[in-house]
Design a protein with these regions (language model features):
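Short intracellular "coupling" helices and adjacent cytoplasmic loop segments at the cytosolic face
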Residues: 1-4, 150
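Intracellular alpha-helical coupling/juxtamembrane segments of multi-pass membrane proteins
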Residues: 3-9, 13-21
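ABC ATP-binding cassette signature C-motif
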Residues: 29, 33-281
């Protein structure tokens, strides 16, 4: 059956990933990673969760492994953020069980949005006014690190209040990537990102050796980053698929309200085939 075929495809994908030799990237382009988690990151067994009569999750089981980059797809209000909280043990399922693997260290992008000091400089916000920060276990000058996020050297002492929306989001990413983690949780991370910052985010995530759980309506983002998707298919039914948004759309067996498009200008440009990855300096 098609369901059995999907399960076999997911198992094949995970076996191939487990057998791959781990890649080591340029430290300057790496997210700050904690010690590796165990191979199993999250296991859900026949999980049920509801708010009153509103069924969010009905009998869902999955195993998320180290290195998985899982996209979560569903209509607005379907419970995607709730699912994240259940998977991470922040909300207890009403039936079934959740098991977190050993050594899991989680960093949340959405929780950083209000953590910028408007009166402080970029240097203050990243390094508490110090010249040096630790990235990938090595000391780096904060100016060089900020240049990786497309800030020119003369902006290092600028106050956060002077930043544009795109610059502010790049600073948030710089803060996120300094947090030691082996699991990244991204709830609508592409909202309000300009194209340049979005491409920067994708490059960083592709290089990240840990596990990623991401809620997004951005089809191109999911296609470029996700190795699998969990899809809300109505009435609490969730299904897991190999690949990103387009792969799900080809494999789906139940009609689902399609995700809304990202803002028009970046989306139109990014619907073209992905360009070759560029290096930042």
């Amino acid at each position: 059956t098609r369901n059995e075929g999907r399960v076999r495809a997911l198992e094949k994908m995970r076996l191939e990933r487990a057998g791959r030799q781990e890649q080591t990237g340029n430290v300057r382009l790496s997210i700050q990673e904690a010690e590796r988690s165990g191979r199993l990151v999250v296991e859900a067994d026949n999980v049920h969760f509801a708010f009153g009569d509103n069924r969010i999750v009905e009998g869902f089981s999955t195993a998320i492994l180290r290195g998985d980059k899982v996209g979560i797809i569903g209509p607005n209000g379907s419970g995607k953020t709730t699912l994240l909280r259940v998977l991470l043990g922040e909300l207890a399922p009403q039936q079934g069980s959740i098991r977190l693997g050993t050594g899991v260290r989680v960093a949340y992008f959405d929780q950083l949005r209000a953590q910028l000091d408007e009166d402080g400089t970029l240097k203050d916000n990243l390094a508490d006014g110090n010249d040096m920060i630790v990235v990938g276990g090595a000391s780096r000058h904060v100016m060089g690190y900020l240049q990786d996020f497309l800030f020119p050297p003369d902006r290092i002492l600028s106050p956060v209040s002077s930043l544009s929306g795109g610059e502010r989001n790049r600073l948030l990413l710089a803060k996120l990537f300094l947090l030691p983690s082996n699991v990244l949780v991204l709830d609508e991370p592409t909202n309000d990102l300009d194209t340049e910052t979005l491409e920067l985010l994708e490059e960083r995530l592709l290089e990240y050796g840990g596990t990623i759980l991401m809620v997004s309506h951005d089809r191109a983002f999911l296609n470029n980053v996700a190795t699998s998707t969990i899809v809300f298919e109505g009435r609490g039914r969730l299904q897991e698929y190999v690949g990103g948004y387009d792969a799900w759309f080809r494999q789906r067996t139940a009609p689902v309200e399609p995700p809304k498009a990202a803002p028009a200008e970046p989306k139109q440009r990014r619907d073209r085939p992905p360009k070759e990855k560029r290096k930042l300096s």
